[in-house]
Regions:
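Domain-core detector
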Residues: 1-150, 158-166
Length: 166
């Protein structure tokens, strides 16, 4: 079906997003990391509001909502990329025995929402969450409990080890 074909194409994109997130983490932490397939599948197939990414895609395709589909794909890519960064940081932390901190970084333009401007430059330990002034919280960009804090988010994490200088 058309929906299955589109979902399969987007799956390829999300696999690439995860690979790129692992590579970004390896670069930030100067450590060789490889993709853990189970962690990648868990990140890609995360159920949000009772739906997988395939269900969310189907909703937009069936409704012929191309704009909504584009926004969904951009948000899914961002979510999976950031999940990979966090997974890679946990892998580094467990194998190297060094603590990792994560810093919230926005793109610093006029489109950054106020709840994310509030987080600019905030650093927390890897296992801690970021808290916005509206009461929302997330371990990383794209993981807030409120959809309005995730959709079109372009924020990223900067990861540093306990021995790094910021």
């Amino acid at each position: 079906s058309k929906v299955a074909q589109i979902a399969d194409d987007i799956l390829s994109l999300l696999i690439r997003a995860y690979q790129q997130g692992i590579t970004a983490t390896a670069d930030m932490l100067a450590y060789d990391l490889t993709v853990d397939v189970d962690s990648m599948e868990e990140a890609i197939y995360e159920v949000i509001d009772g739906k997988t990414f395939e269900d969310r895609i189907a909703d937009h395709v069936i409704a012929r909502d191309l704009s909504g589909l584009q926004t969904l794909v951009e948000s899914e890519y961002h979510r999976v990329f950031n999940a990979a960064e966090e997974d890679g940081a946990y892998e580094f932390q467990s194998t190297r025995g060094l603590g990792v901190s994560k810093k919230w970084v926005t793109v610093r333009d006029e489109a950054v929402r106020d709840t994310h401007k509030y987080l600019e430059g905030v650093s927390v330990a890897l296992d801690e969450e970021f808290y916005t002034f509206d009461g929302d919280h997330a371990s990383r960009p794209g993981e807030f409990t409120k959809a309005e804090n995730n959709v079109n988010c372009r924020c990223v994490l900067k990861l540093v080890t306990d021995t790094s200088q910021d």
